[in-house]
Regions:
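Short helix-loop "hinge" at the ATP-lid/N-box region of the Bergerat-fold HATPase_c
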Residues: 42-43
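Short alpha-helical Gxxx[C/S/T] motif in the catalytic ATP-binding
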Residues: 103-107
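Conserved micro-motifs of the catalytic ATP-binding
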Residues: 23-26
Length: 138
């Protein structure tokens, strides 16, 4: 799983026993793309390295995938900006760097297309986590 990335990063997966047999009706390619975008965000925003944990849980017909890192985290201002401006694509402000924010936009669109929700949380210097929640097939 860690092949092809710097030794400064470790990626771990934790699948809760109750999630092992949960079923999510989805486009696997798109869900993989969303997860990859979140992992790449952790790597990109933590050039000094970090630990990235992907965890999968299942409770009451909800499948929850969390991508968390112990990197630089998010300031309250950046967190608010991500919530208020889910992406910069719609902006006509030429001062904005359009390379930023598009990965999260794509993740949000993929999740919502699958009837799910996305929540970003983080604390400055304590890491960031993105929680994707989906209704699972019983």
């Amino acid at each position: 799983l860690n092949s092809g990335i710097s030794d400064a990063y470790t990626i771990e997966i934790d699948i809760a026993p109750e999630a092992e047999n949960a079923i999510l009706e989805c486009d696997a390619r798109l869900i993989s793309r969303a997860i990859n975008n979140l992992v790449q965000n952790s790597i990109k925003h933590n050039p000094q390295g970090c630990k990235i944990l992907l965890s999968l849980k299942y409770t009451e017909e909800t499948l929850t995938l969390t991508v968390a890192d112990n990197g630089v985290g998010l300031t309250p201002e950046k967190l608010q900006e991500l919530e208020e401006k889910p992406h910069y694509m719609e902006s006509t402000d030429e001062r904005l760097d359009l390379r930023h924010g598009l990965g999260l936009l794509l993740v949000r669109q993929i999740v919502e297309a699958h009837g799910g929700s996305m929540k970003i949380d983080g604390v400055s210097n304590q890491g960031c986590q993105t929680v994707l929640s989906f209704r699972s097939v019983p």
